[in-house]
């Protein structure tokens, strides 16, 4: 019988005392629940001086923002912990460290990152971290290369694909990215003023064919162990540092999905900046976002190709020029998935603060409309946008 029970703050303290690796566990005396996501309880555990020393995270058996009417598997906690452990192995400087995991309690203890800030909040506040995009590109190159066919023996790769099978969480992604925004659904969430724009998504045959192709690639292309939800709210930043967290959507899928989701969130910030900062002040920040996108992709591509040249184990995949050709396909996928992220965050269940916190209704609606229009263009034109420079030109065109 499972010993699962929902943690209280007292439980979190007792658990951290046992598993957080603190030299003097009795110094841990209090906890505060700080989770602002949709799926989990998250506790900060404090010492006697009020300093946060560890994080205790527990999966809930339902979607928190909906309630018990939307049940979820607790096995996602195992998948998150194992994904983060695997990613830490390949990119320790950019992945949160897991101290302990218990599959029956669906709980993990991880390093405290109180000296970092959530990147999304910093982007909204126009606090610039010039190294962040390059570090994110390096993280993605390291973890995606080292869990791909370029590096893993075929037997090991197939074993890992089975280990990280994540059907319940993938189903959520499939619905929120590729189904809900293109049909009338109770989970969709958008202002009535955008009804005409959203109805146009449902009626666009060319768009829906392109979305179907993206969904099929999400199903069928087990290229590497993805983070699965790598957006600016699942990344912590500090001066000179970046750490990825929240990997419960981890599974083996198309590399372009992680790249596209990351770029998509930078573009969501781009779309929201006029409402956050005012049109005049937003101009420079928007150029920074475009520069971030350029740095993210070029760092990822250069690092991935360098790793491929040095470490590819398969003789056929090591043939000169193949890694470069492979990345062209990854790029096309990334552009399409980027567009789907823009649309689902504008009309679907889960929005982003970059736009939702804009106070002026008319401006907020215009920023949402911009994201929808841009997302649609990127999905439909993905195969023709053949470089990051071409992507940035398209973004400027739709501004």
UniProtKB/Swiss-Prot annotation:
Catalyzes the phosphorylation of methylthioribose into methylthioribose-1-phosphate. GO terms for molecular function: ATP binding; S-methyl-5-thioribose kinase activity. ATP binds at residues 40, 57, 111-113, 246-248. Keywords: Amino-acid biosynthesis, ATP-binding, Kinase, Methionine biosynthesis, Nucleotide-binding, Transferase. Homodimer. Substrate binds at residues 229, 344. Its EC number is 2.7.1.100. Disulfide bonds: none annotated. It catalyses: 5-(methylsulfanyl)-D-ribose + ATP = 5-(methylsulfanyl)-alpha-D-ribose 1-phosphate + ADP + H(+). This is Methylthioribose kinase. One of its GO terms (biological process) is L-methionine salvage from methylthioadenosine. The keyword Kinase applies. Belongs to the methylthioribose kinase family. Pathway: Amino-acid biosynthesis; L-methionine biosynthesis via salvage pathway; S-methyl-5-thio-alpha-D-ribose 1-phosphate from S-methyl-5'-thioadenosine (hydrolase route): step 2/2. Pfam families: APH.
């Amino acid at each position: 019988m499972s010993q699962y029970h929902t943690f209280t703050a007292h439980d979190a303290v007792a658990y951290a005392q046992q598993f957080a690796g603190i030299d003097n566990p009795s110094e841990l005396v209090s906890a505060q629940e700080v989770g602002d996501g949709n799926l989990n309880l998250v506790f900060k555990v404090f010492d006697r001086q009020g300093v946060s020393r560890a994080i205790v995270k527990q999966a809930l058996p339902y979607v928190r923002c909906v309630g018990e009417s939307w049940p979820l598997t607790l096995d996602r906690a195992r998948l998150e912990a194992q994904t983060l452990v695997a990613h830490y192995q390949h990119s320790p400087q950019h992945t949160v460290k897991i101290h302990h995991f218990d599959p029956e309690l669906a709980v993990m203890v991880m390093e405290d990152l109180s000296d970092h800030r959530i990147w999304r909040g910093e982007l909204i506040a126009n606090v610039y971290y010039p190294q962040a995009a390059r570090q994110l590109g390096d993280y993605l190159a390291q973890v995606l290369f080292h869990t791909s066919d370029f590096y893993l023996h075929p037997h090991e790769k197939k074993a890992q694909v089975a280990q990280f099978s994540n059907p319940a969480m993938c189903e959520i992604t499939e619905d929120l990215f590729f189904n809900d925004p293109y049909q009338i659904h109770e989970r969709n969430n958008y202002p009535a003023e955008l009804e005409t724009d959203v109805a146009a998504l449902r009626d666009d045959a060319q768009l829906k064919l392109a979305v179907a192709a993206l969904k099929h690639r999400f199903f069928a292309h087990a290229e590497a162990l993805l983070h699965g939800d790598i957006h600016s709210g699942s990344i912590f930043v500090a001066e000179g540092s970046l750490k990825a967290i929240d990997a419960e959507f981890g599974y083996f899928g198309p590399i372009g999905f992680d790249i596209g989701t990351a770029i998509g969130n930078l573009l969501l910030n781009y779309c929201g900046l006029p409402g956050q900062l005012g049109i005049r002040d937003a101009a420079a920040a928007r150029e920074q976002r475009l520069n971030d996108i350029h740095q993210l992709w070029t760092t990822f591509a250069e690092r991935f190709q360098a790793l491929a040249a040095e470490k590819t184990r398969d003789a056929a995949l090591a043939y000169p020029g193949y890694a470069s050709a492979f990345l062209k396909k990854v790029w096309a996928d990334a552009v399409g998935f980027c567009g789907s992220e823009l649309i689902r965050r504008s009309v679907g269940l889960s929005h982003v603060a970059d736009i939702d916190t804009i106070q002026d209704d008319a401006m907020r609606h215009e920023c949402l409309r911009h994201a929808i229009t841009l997302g649609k263009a990127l999905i439909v034109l993905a195969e023709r946008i053949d470089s990051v420079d071409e992507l940035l030109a398209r973004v400027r065109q739709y501004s």
